[in-house]
């Protein structure tokens, strides 16, 4: 692919422009995504994050000059890529959809893997997302300095540090890298350590790095720039004067500016004075750009009050937009500069906003979230746990939400979940009323997987209680033997000694013969002259049977079965079979065969 000549005057019409490649960072929780970016940008935003997990996308521009100063081996290369723009996508797999948005938005990605732990469920999910989005990626094998015996050299390229290690350490590093290679191969990816890759189009590069010491970071940046320069230059070429398109990361109040929106601009140009279309809680609106504030190079867009006022911004970049009427803009929504067809732009945004990727059910949970991405992510996580969602909306929890949740029939789904969104005062009052507090379970928080864990724990406990109550009502299979020499009374009621051959015998059940005919109703049981309610396989007990005469309905040494109603048989075979041991299952099969001779569908 030949390099295109790029003119530096961005004000000329139809001037080709190589935009900054957008890079997303994905991986398992706590494997070091944010720490890696901290090392690259020389700042720290970890401490203020909920649960130490990034909850909103951030953006960092790393200019090519900074990258070249870190990666000495690139100084003699003719680099046309202006730098790298990193999106710090949330780390936990509960944010699948938001990460997928990042993947679709990004030109390339870094998948972070703790070299000491290897692939985890979220890591595997990350590579699947990137495969689905057709986004090329590099694997950063982080925490290199935690390899036992590793001797660190601050900010050193990997190969230089690697050469200084003893044989035992180098062998351990090789083993850890090839563990990653093997896991990637299991998922259909060919990979190798970056310095051994001859064809980056066919093989994934694995770059061992340490965010703590900076080792390997120059190599990682060099591989990213090399990939973009070699394989993406044509795709990254755009017309400067095209109308800008971006995604709203966050709505923020800024002193002296009022409500502003942080935007990742991924196409075209946005200028002061442009009319833009935005998605708000009141629908698609238009407004005029009052000012543009771009982060200074090497600054994170989440760190406030460090912005440059600019007249225009060219993709790709993180930019703060100040304009009237931004306070109701929905985070995660598209923003477009209006060109020749304003209605087409507004219709396009409206369509995108209504096509939220959420599967709803006639009955299920009600969830509210602060952003579209968070809403989709929460719904996806619930769906993965086979939890239906009845209603999912962006916005605050209202009185109407509480009232609607109370009407849900299934107590397991009579739940209201709020992710990172406030509860309106009248809704708070309603949730405190005893009638609603007893009926509705409310969960809220700013870390999705914590909310999910709390819900699952509550649901499992409630389900256990409900199952226990249900089990108490279900008649379980059992088989008994009438013992010889143990007829204590012939009838009214018959009292005999029996041995439970299998299953659990409870009072109040009907007994049937092996030909299916009724033998009477078990009214009471005694074990060692003590009244009991149930007996188990191997027990020998005395039982009283109403409606039976020994020698007529049954006799000694007869085997009797517990009579199970047809509707109970269906529940036992479809829902409770795992709770039965093999002997009880055999008795159930023996019992159902009696009735399925005439009707094969009995109890099904």
From Swiss-Prot:
<dbReference type="InterPro" id="IPR000795">
    <property type="entry name" value="T_Tr_GTP-bd_dom"/>
</dbReference>
<dbReference type="InterPro" id="IPR036925">
    <property type="entry name" value="TIF_IF2_dom3_sf"/>
</dbReference>
<comment type="similarity">
    <text>Belongs to the TRAFAC class translation factor GTPase superfamily. Classic translation factor GTPase family. IF-2 subfamily.</text>
</comment>
<feature type="region of interest" description="G2">
    <location>
        <begin position="52"/>
        <end position="56"/>
    </location>
</feature>
<dbReference type="InterPro" id="IPR009000">
    <property type="entry name" value="Transl_B-barrel_sf"/>
</dbReference>
<comment type="function">
    <text>Function in general translation initiation by promoting the binding of the formylmethionine-tRNA to ribosomes. Seems to function along with eIF-2.</text>
</comment>
<feature type="region of interest" description="G5">
    <location>
        <begin position="210"/>
        <end position="212"/>
    </location>
</feature>
<protein>
    <recommendedName>
        <fullName>Probable translation initiation factor IF-2</fullName>
    </recommendedName>
</protein>
<dbReference type="InterPro" id="IPR015760">
    <property type="entry name" value="TIF_IF2"/>
</dbReference>
<dbReference type="Pfam" id="PF03144">
    <property type="entry name" value="GTP_EFTU_D2"/>
</dbReference>
<feature type="binding site">
    <location>
        <begin position="27"/>
        <end position="34"/>
    </location>
    <ligand>
        <name>GTP</name>
    </ligand>
</feature>
<dbReference type="Pfam" id="PF00009">
    <property type="entry name" value="GTP_EFTU"/>
</dbReference>
<feature type="binding site">
    <location>
        <begin position="142"/>
        <end position="145"/>
    </location>
    <ligand>
        <name>GTP</name>
    </ligand>
</feature>
<keyword id="KW-0547">Nucleotide-binding</keyword>
<dbReference type="Pfam" id="PF11987">
    <property type="entry name" value="IF-2"/>
</dbReference>
<feature type="domain" description="tr-type G">
    <location>
        <begin position="18"/>
        <end position="232"/>
    </location>
</feature>
<feature type="binding site">
    <location>
        <begin position="88"/>
        <end position="92"/>
    </location>
    <ligand>
        <name>GTP</name>
    </ligand>
</feature>
<feature type="region of interest" description="G4">
    <location>
        <begin position="142"/>
        <end position="145"/>
    </location>
</feature>
<dbReference type="InterPro" id="IPR005225">
    <property type="entry name" value="Small_GTP-bd"/>
</dbReference>
<dbReference type="InterPro" id="IPR004544">
    <property type="entry name" value="TF_aIF-2_arc"/>
</dbReference>
<keyword id="KW-0396">Initiation factor</keyword>
<dbReference type="GO" id="GO:0003924">
    <property type="term" value="F:GTPase activity"/>
</dbReference>
<dbReference type="GO" id="GO:0003743">
    <property type="term" value="F:translation initiation factor activity"/>
</dbReference>
<dbReference type="Pfam" id="PF14578">
    <property type="entry name" value="GTP_EFTU_D4"/>
</dbReference>
<feature type="region of interest" description="G1">
    <location>
        <begin position="27"/>
        <end position="34"/>
    </location>
</feature>
<dbReference type="InterPro" id="IPR027417">
    <property type="entry name" value="P-loop_NTPase"/>
</dbReference>
<dbReference type="InterPro" id="IPR029459">
    <property type="entry name" value="EFTU-type"/>
</dbReference>
<dbReference type="InterPro" id="IPR004161">
    <property type="entry name" value="EFTu-like_2"/>
</dbReference>
<dbReference type="GO" id="GO:0005737">
    <property type="term" value="C:cytoplasm"/>
</dbReference>
<dbReference type="InterPro" id="IPR023115">
    <property type="entry name" value="TIF_IF2_dom3"/>
</dbReference>
<keyword id="KW-0648">Protein biosynthesis</keyword>
<feature type="region of interest" description="G3">
    <location>
        <begin position="88"/>
        <end position="91"/>
    </location>
</feature>
<keyword id="KW-0342">GTP-binding</keyword>
<dbReference type="GO" id="GO:0005525">
    <property type="term" value="F:GTP binding"/>
</dbReference>
């Amino acid at each position: 692919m030949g390099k295109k000549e790029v003119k530096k005057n961005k004000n000329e019409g139809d001037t080709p422009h190589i935009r900054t490649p957008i890079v997303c960072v994905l991986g398992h929780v706590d494997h070091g995504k944010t720490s890696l970016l901290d090392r690259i940008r020389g700042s720290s935003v970890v401490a203020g994050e909920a649960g130490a997990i990034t909850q909103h996308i951030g953006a960092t521009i790393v200019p090519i000059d900074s990258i070249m100063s870190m990666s000495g081996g690139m100084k003699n290369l003719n680099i046309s890529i202006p730098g790298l723009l990193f999106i710090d996508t949330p780390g936990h797999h509960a944010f699948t959809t938001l990460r997928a948005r990042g993947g679709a938005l990004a030109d390339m990605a870094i998948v972070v893997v703790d070299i000491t732990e290897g692939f985890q469920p979220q890591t595997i999910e990350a590579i699947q997302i990137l495969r689905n989005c057709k986004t090329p990626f590099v694997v950063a094998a982080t925490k290199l300095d935690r390899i036992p015996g590793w001797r660190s050299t601050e900010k050193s390229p990997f190969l230089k540090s690697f050469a200084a290690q003893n044989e035992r350490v180098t062998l351990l590093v090789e083993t850890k890298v090839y563990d990653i290679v093997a896991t990637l191969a299991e998922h259909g990816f060919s990979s190798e350590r970056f310095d051994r890759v001859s064809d980056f189009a066919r093989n994934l590069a694995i770059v061992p790095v340490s965010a703590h010491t900076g080792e390997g970071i120059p190599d990682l940046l060099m591989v990213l720039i090399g990939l973009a320069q070699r394989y993406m230059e044509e795709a990254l070429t755009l017309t400067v004067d095209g109308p800008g398109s971006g995604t709203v990361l966050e709505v923020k109040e800024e002193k002296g500016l009022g409500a502003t929106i942080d935007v990742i601009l991924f196409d075209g140009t946005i200028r002061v004075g442009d009319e833009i279309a935005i998605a708000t809680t009141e629908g698609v609106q238009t407004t005029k750009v009052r000012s543009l504030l771009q982060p200074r190079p090497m600054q994170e867009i989440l760190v406030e009050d460090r912005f440059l006022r600019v007249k225009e911004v060219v993709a790709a970049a993180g930019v703060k937009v100040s304009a009237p009427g931004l306070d109701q803009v929905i985070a995660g929504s598209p923003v477009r500069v209006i060109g020749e067809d304003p209605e087409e732009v507004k219709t396009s945004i409206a369509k995108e906003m209504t096509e939220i990727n959420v599967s709803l059910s006639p009955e299920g949970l009600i969830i509210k979230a602060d952003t579209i991405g968070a809403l989709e992510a929460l719904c996806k996580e619930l769906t993965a746990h086979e939890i239906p969602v009845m209603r999912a909306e962006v916005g605050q929890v209202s009185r109407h939400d509480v009232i609607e949740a109370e009407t849900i029939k299934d107590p397991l789904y009579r739940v209201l979940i709020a992710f990172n969104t406030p509860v309106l005062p009248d809704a708070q009052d309603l949730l405190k009323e005893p009638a609603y507090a007893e009926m509705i379970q409310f969960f809220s928080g700013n870390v999705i997987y914590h909310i999910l864990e709390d819900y699952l724990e509550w649901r499992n406990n409630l389900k256990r209680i409900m199952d226990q109550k249900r089990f108490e009502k279900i008649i379980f299979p059992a088989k008994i033997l009438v013992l010889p020499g143990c007829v204590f009374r012939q009838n009214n009621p018959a009292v005999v000694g029996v041995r439970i051959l299998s299953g659990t015998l409870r009072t109040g059940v009907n007994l049937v013969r092996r030909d299916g005919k009724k033998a009477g109703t078990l009214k009471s049981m005694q074990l060692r002259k003590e009244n009991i309610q149930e007996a188990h396989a191997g027990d020998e007990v005395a039982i009283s049977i109403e409606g039976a005469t020994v020698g007529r309905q049954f006799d000694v040494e007869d085997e009797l079965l517990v009579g199970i109603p047809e509707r109970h048989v269906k529940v036992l075979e479809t829902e409770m079979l795992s709770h039965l041991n093999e002997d009880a299952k055999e008795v159930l099969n023996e019992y159902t065969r009696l009735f399925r001779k005439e009707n094969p569908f009995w109890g099904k």
